[in-house]
């Protein structure tokens, strides 16, 4: 069993002292982290944070992404929320932004998508599996193809690449360093 210790921060204020866990303190500065697998729990947390911050004011919100990817539907829920709020969303790739992590990195407000100089990005075709009767397998296969087309169109729009190039590049794992990710259009700048 891995025990994760979350640091706390003590701040002095007019009432004395306020204790925050590190993530809550950073949230005060409009900073959100997506780390690890993107799943329904991650999506609920990130969506709640985005909506909360947007309800306070419409200043920029920063999302740091270090994720191997995960659920397409959970990722699209985060994406849709990023698009409906009034605040600009700055995305910053740290470590590895792969699969849905790369998609979310590319989905920040244009001009406000960054990557650290030693971070990496990986895009690929969505993964899925099916079991059951032939009809059920066909339904799942059709759904996977539909989601692939949807994600590839969105990634093409985000990166200003052609759909043909995205379709070709996502057939296999396609890794990019920071410079390549910037040239590809996933991000706009490298933070050094």
What do the predicted segments below correspond to?
Residues 1-192:
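Terminal-region recognition feature
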């Amino acid at each position: 069993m891995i025990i994760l210790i979350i640091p706390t921060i003590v701040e002095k204020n007019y009432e004395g002292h306020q204790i925050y866990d590190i993530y809550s303190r950073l949230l005060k500065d409009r900073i959100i982290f997506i780390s690890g697998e993107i799943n329904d729990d991650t999506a609920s947390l990130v969506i709640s944070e985005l909506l909360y911050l947007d309800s306070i004011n419409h200043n920029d919100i920063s999302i740091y992404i270090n994720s191997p990817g995960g659920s397409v539907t959970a990722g699209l829920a985060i994406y849709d929320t990023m698009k409906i709020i009034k605040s600009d969303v700055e995305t910053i790739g740290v470590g590895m932004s792969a699969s849905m992590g790369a998609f979310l990195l590319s989905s920040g407000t244009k001009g406000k998508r960054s990557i650290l100089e030693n971070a990496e990005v990986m895009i690929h075709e969505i993964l899925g599996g099916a079991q059951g009767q032939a009809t059920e397998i066909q339904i799942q296969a059709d759904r996977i193809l539909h989601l692939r087309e949807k994600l590839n169109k969105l990634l093409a729009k985000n990166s200003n690449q052609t759909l043909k190039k995205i379709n070709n590049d996502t057939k296999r794992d396609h890794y990019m360093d920071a410079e390549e990710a910037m040239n590809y259009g996933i991000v706009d700048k490298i933070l050094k």
